[in-house]
Amino acid sequence: MSMHKALTIAGSDSSGGAGIQADLKTFQEKNVYGMTALTVIVAMDPNNSWNHQVFPIDTDTIRAQLATITDGIGVDAMKTGMLPTVDIIELAAKTIKEKQLKNVVIDPVMVCKGANEVLYPEHAQALREQLAPLATVITPNLFEASQLSGMDELKTVDDMIEAAKKIHALGAQYVVITGGGKLKHEKAVDVLYDGETAEVLESEMIDTPYTHGAGCTFSAAVTAELAKGAEVKEAIYAAKEFITAAIKESFPLNQYVGPTKHSALRLNQQS
C-alpha cells in the first residue's frame, strides 16, 4: 500500500510549536508522510522577552530542496507557510505551476504569534498576485485576511464573509478565514467560502492563551486530508475538528509561549 505524501514549504520554529515542526507533527497524526522545504529559521531570544529572530534561507538551497521532493519523490498535497522574501514567494509559485502540483494549501503567514510587528508587510501584494490564484484552499487569519482583501480590521462575521469573497476573487478556489476566539462571539468562528456559499463554522470557545502554531496546524491538517483524497470541504471540517481538540489541550511551554497538543484528537478517540 502506498503512503500518502505531503509537502510543506515553510519555516522552522525552534520552539517546536509552529512552522514545519507543527506541520510534520500534524501530518504524522493524520498518517501522512511529511516532507519539507525549509524557507527560514525563526529563533526566539529568551533574554529579550522571546523576541523573534528571523534567518531566511537562500533561494538556491530552497530550490534544491524542492527538486529533491518534486522531481525525486512526488506529492499528493502541499502547503506553504512562512515565505520570508518576495523571491521565495515567486519560487514557490513557479514550482507549483511548473510541476503542476495539486491540492495546494496556502497559509499566508504574515506575523509570528507573540510578536506585535508585521514580519513582511511588503509581501502582501506578492501573496495576492502570485500564490492566491494557485490555492485550492487559502487559510488566512483575521489580520492576514484584511491584508489580502484590502479591508480594514475585520470585526464581525459579515466582515469575514466580505473579505472571503474578495480573496476568492483573487483566484483561490476555497477561502477559510480563521477567526477563532478573536471575534466578540460566544463561539469560535471561522468562515468558509467556495465562490457561491459562505458557511460559518462554529466550535466551542476555548479560553486559553496557548494557541501557538494553531494556524500552521490547521492548514497542515487540511493538507493532510487532501493528500488522502478527501473532498475539500470534508478536509476543512476534519481540520477544524483536529485543531479544536489540539487547542483544547494546549499547554504552556514556558512563560512566553504555549503550543497546541497535536496528539489530542487521537488520544481522545482512543480513550
Curated annotation (Swiss-Prot):
Binding site for ATP: 141, 178-182, 190, 206, 215, 240
Cellular component terms per the entry's GO annotation: cytosol
Signal peptide from the UniProt entry: none
This protein's record includes keyword Transferase: yes
Gene Ontology MF, one: metal ion binding
Sequence positions that bind Mg(2+): 144
One biological process term in Gene Ontology: thiamine biosynthetic process
Catalysed reactions listed for this entry: pyridoxal + ATP = pyridoxal 5'-phosphate + ADP + H(+)
EC number(s) reported in the record: 2.7.1.35
Keywords, in A-Z order: ATP-binding, Kinase, Magnesium, Metal-binding, Nucleotide-binding, Transferase
Matching Pfam families: Phos_pyr_kin
InterPro entries: HMP/HMP-P_kinase_dom, PM/HMP-P_kinase-1, Ribokinase-like
Gene3D superfamilies the record matches: 3.40.1190.20
CDD domains membership: HMPP_kinase (cd01169)
Family: Belongs to the ThiD family.
Function of the protein: Phosphorylates B6 vitamers; functions in a salvage pathway. Uses pyridoxal, pyridoxine, and pyridoxamine as substrates. Can also use hydroxymethylpyrimidine (HMP) as substrate.
SUBUNIT field: Homodimer.
Protein name, per record: Pyridoxine kinase
Organism: Bacillus subtilis (strain 168)
Gene (name only): pdxK
